[in-house]
Amino acid sequence: VEYERFADGEHVVRVPEAVAGERATIVASTVDSDAHVQVLQLQDAAREAGATEVVTVVPYMGYARQDEAFRDGEPVSSRAMARAISTGTDRVITVNPHEPAVYDFFDVPATLVDAAGLLADPLPALSEPLFLSPDEGAIGLAHTVRDAYGAGETDFFEKERDYDTGDIEISTNGAPAEGRDVVLVDDIIATGSTMSESVAVLDDRDAGRVFVTCVHPMLASNALTK
């Protein structure tokens, strides 16, 4: 695929002519607004080039965390993006979206791929492992990684977010961490604030080694430093 950006900031893409009469599979993570536009252009270009079917694979679906209007006057952004993607494709495949409910927003068949189990592969031998998610919503990921590892306990932190300031407050839920190896599991690490605060809480509780894992390491700004 060829990409070009014009002086005014607009994009254009070009797909190989070989897609004529074939199924075109577009693989593109929508990590920012430009990427969303390029996906829509790729879909249209594939149709224009004669593809008989278009399958859109979105490993990371941007805006999936905005699955509801959190304040008056806000859109349901993930719904808007899903509808836009649906217009140019026959099927959508994506990996561990922040909220599985976003699949209801697509107007074409959508498939979820769960990659969380792969997070267990690089883990070393753990001592009394505890698999923790930063909030209750991600506990399923912790279960999946624990099951893939083959041993351990799961639990989650209580997390409260102030949608006006963006501040996050984290508190423990109950499972003892002292002296145990802890694996933190989440779907996305964006700014890193949640994970860094979780690590700090575990340090205060005298946990053993702490391993941070996620499916989608966005690592915006200074997240890696945190």
Predicted regions and their residues:
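PRPP-associated nucleotide enzymes
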Residues: 1-226
